[in-house]
Amino acid sequence: MKYSAGDFDVVVIGAGHAGCEAALASARMGCKTLICTMNLDSIALMACNPNIGGTAKGHLVREIDALGGEMGINIDHTFIQSRMLNTSKGPAVHSLRAQADKKRYSERMKHLLEKEDNVVLRQLEVIEIDVEDNEVKGVLTKNGAYFTTKAIILCTGTYLKGKIIIGDIIYSSGPSGLYPANDLSQSLLDLGINLRRFKTGTPARINKRSVDFSKMIEQPGDEKIVPFSFIHNKLDKDQISCYLTYTSEETHKIIHENIHRSPLYNGSIEGVGPRYCPSIEDKIVRFPDKDKHQIFIEPEGENTEELYVGGMSSSLPEDVQIKMYRSVPGLENAEILRTAYAIEYDCIDPQQLDLTLEFKNINGLYGAGQFNGSSGYEEAAAQGLIAGINAVLKIKEKNPLILKRSDAYIGVLIDDLVTKGTNEPYRMMTSRAEYRLLLRQDNADLRLTELGYKVGLVKEDRYNKFLNRKKNVENEIERLRNMQITGKREINEFLLEKGSTELKKPISLYELIKRPELDYFKVESLDDKRPSLSDDEKEEINIIAKYEGYINKQLEQVEQFKKYEDRLIPKSINYLDIKGLRLEAIQKLEKIKPINIGQASRISGVSPADISVLLIYMERKNREN
């Protein structure tokens, strides 16, 4: 029996990492928000790896935080180990990664939603999206409750017609044994939304007491803990170690002998899996020259004996899994607590969305996270945040927030999904960003906090803290530029001691820092007027000084491409009217409906010649008007 259950500005379907950010953004920007989840105990669930961040993903978390999102703050409160990755490389690829207490991470996020003034949190299954005249009107739940709304954000994760696969055992399920959402897919199909099947998987969880750590390499956390959130200056924590081991010859033998029983190779799995996170059986088949693969043993929390076996995702039958895991050094007596599995689910072709993450053909309907064809908690949270922000901005009749590729990794992520599309679960990587030296994790606040403040997510106290940090960095760089160092005997002795050359003429301290063998920290003894600065401010100053030449080159590239990004394409344009455009280009441009020339130029199948034709047509139309 259908009944009227209430009216909301925004309804968020799903309370995973995308849904939580979407709901909190919507509520904190002043909109009455309903967030529906299949299970209140699975909010912000880490259904796979128990960590946040990593290469490129750490950048996304910093950007979410800079815009006023919650993920960085939440992991800072609930981490059990922290490490900075890629420290032997340049600052563009330095990435923070934190091991999470997954239960506490979920509980804290749930509590935030419960406490948020404008949020109503409900355990409900949405089965139908109500649309009239291409505009959302409401949602219907399995219990008959009908909620009217102005905007709907779909954050369904892997629940949409979810199907668990373990060998020849196949059954309908969401992740981690939770209920799937089997009815909503049909409603989306009825609305003309194109769905497809993707696949992901997760390794087994084992009991800590059954593991022999003496056969493994310990991986402790960093001594100096760097917070994810810019609001935290310092974090102290007793950390829990992870451990590294490897597959053995026996592991590979077991997999080869049972490969015919793998759903990946016998046709049981239809969905496309993630290229950059293959199962262990896939790795061994695809890389036969490798005699061993890394396996990471990761704790799932402080108050559990469960360990995550990173690098051994599998969908092999359970009997094969037991033998396979026990063939790994240190896991000879491993007790499996949760079996590894693959999961198939419905998701969309993200080319049906525009850069705000709203469907092109349905006003007020947005998508975020794995529903959009991405993989990963961080990618999901980033999209949820942007979808939440844009849903509210549209309701308030304000301009949308569209991040460019030169603004943020979030801009790269969304542009890739919407403009290029994806045929497999999309994972963020530093190599996807053209301007990665500008998009470092250390300067995410300098790039994005102003935007977060303008949309209303960054509050006054945090904004003032940001302005203070920005001023400190700018003032110190200016001071360094103006401070002259001369070739005094003691200074030249210091330089020779550091393996540098003597000064023949006065030089600014800023220029001196640029020498390969020196940096901001090493020249402190030459600088008796140095102000008191935080560690992150010092690091920011050092990077700006050391990499100024490279940074300026990338800024010049951004300016060159800016003319294309700023050249807006009229919404009323009819590509069929443009003589000289190839048929493929017309079809792609009609489908994706790029908002500017820059986006049009990145569409697969649209050539530079097509862009020239389009520009000439637009110039002619401008003159006529």
UniProtKB/Swiss-Prot annotation:
Gene Ontology MF terms: flavin adenine dinucleotide binding
Cofactor dependence: FAD
Residues engaged in binding FAD: G14, A15, G16, H17, A18, G19
Subcellular location: Cytoplasm
InterPro entries: FAD/NAD-bd_sf, GIDA_C_N, MnmG, MnmG-rel, MnmG-rel_CS, MnmG_C, MnmG_C_subdom, MnmG_C_subdom_sf
The organism's place on the tree of life at top rank: Bacteria
Annotated residues for binding of NAD(+): 273-287
Keywords: Cytoplasm, FAD, Flavoprotein, NAD, tRNA processing
One biological process term in Gene Ontology: tRNA methylation
Pfam families reported in the protein's UniProt record: GIDA, GIDA_C_1st, SAM_GIDA_C
Function: NAD-binding protein involved in the addition of a carboxymethylaminomethyl (cmnm) group at the wobble position (U34) of certain tRNAs, forming tRNA-cmnm(5)s(2)U34.
Membership in a protein family: Belongs to the MnmG family.
Complex formation: Homodimer. Heterotetramer of two MnmE and two MnmG subunits.
Protein name: tRNA uridine 5-carboxymethylaminomethyl modification enzyme MnmG
Gene: mnmG
